Amino acid sequence: CCKYGWTCLLGCSPCGC
């Protein structure tokens, strides 16, 4: 998953952000 805390990391697959 691309989530890190409350944010989404760039360059990752979407994970319901």
Swiss-Prot record:
It is found in: Secreted. The cysteine framework is IV (CC-C-C-C-C). It comes from Conus pennaceus (Feathered cone). Mu-conotoxins block voltage-gated sodium channels (Nav). Blocks reversibly sodium channels in molluskan neurons, but has no effect on sodium currents in bovine chromaffin cells or in rat brain synaptosomes. Induces paralysis in bivalve mollusks (Mytilus). No effect are observed on fish (Gambusia) and fly larvae (Sarcophaga). PnIVB is approximately 6 times more potent than PnIVA in blockade of the sodium current in Lymnaea neurons. The record marks Y4 as: Important for binding and activity. The keyword Zinc does not apply. GO terms for molecular function: sodium channel regulator activity; toxin activity. Contains 3 disulfide bonds. They are not added, since framework IV presents two different connectivities (I-V, II-III, IV-VI and I-III, II-V, IV-VI). Belongs to the conotoxin M superfamily. This is Mu-conotoxin PnIVA. Keywords: Disulfide bond, Ion channel impairing toxin, Neurotoxin, Secreted, Toxin, Voltage-gated sodium channel impairing toxin. Expressed by the venom duct. Its main location: secreted. GO terms for cellular component: extracellular region.
